[in-house]
């Protein structure tokens, strides 16, 4: 899947660990107040973007350019910076902009490092919650919370019958489509919160997260962390996620395959 050795992982992990701290400082010093909000859809719906989204992305891009000037960058707000490199950084400056706009705590900064278009390292940073998640190689994932580091793993005792599930279908599935997956709605459902839901599977607090219409910047940063924590992630057809797609995250293949079967009528 990748050609990174231990030294490579260490270089990128050190960069992302520092970047997480810098992003949190930037939020509290300059971006938490007096931001402006606009609507990307302009009368066709509501997809908010703020001046803080753009400032975060510019900051992240500048840090990447300073350290890895030959790498490609894809960001939600400023598009694709192409380069002659197999490495691409994928950025969602604020995942959960609606939460950000109303002063909620569950929005995050998302960054992945992709090699040959597949994510190999990820950072999910929650400035307000004062924690961030990261994989420091392909077999170990961690949460840094209140300056303390803790290794995370999925719930290894999870079973399908007692799986704790979160699903975000609003705005994506019609009522007719939802009627085709009744079992999903009869499972142990919990609130959903964008990338936080994926991280809650990675650290064993949830046993399944289902989302619709994720862009690569919405999901790629979480994928290496989930897999390094022992989890399983795919689209609803059990394929790698390489473009905008529906997402399923679980702690093991047994639960994964059973939920995929439940989703099959609409996948």
Predicted regions and their residues:
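An extended, acidic
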Residues: 153-267
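DPxDG-like acidic metal-binding loop motif
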Residues: 83-142
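N-terminal subdomain of lithium-sensitive/metallo-dependent phosphomonoesterases centered on the IMPase/IPPase/PAP
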Residues: 1-94
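Short helix-loop capping/hinge motifs at secondary-structure junctions, enriched
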Residues: 139-149, 254-258
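Short hydrophobic/aromatic-rich beta-strand segments that constitute the beta-sheet cores
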Residues: 134, 141-145, 167, 208
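Generic detector of well-ordered alpha-helical packing
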Residues: 54, 77, 93-96, 127, ...
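Residue-level signal for inorganic ion chemistry
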Residues: 23-27, 53, 64, 97, ...
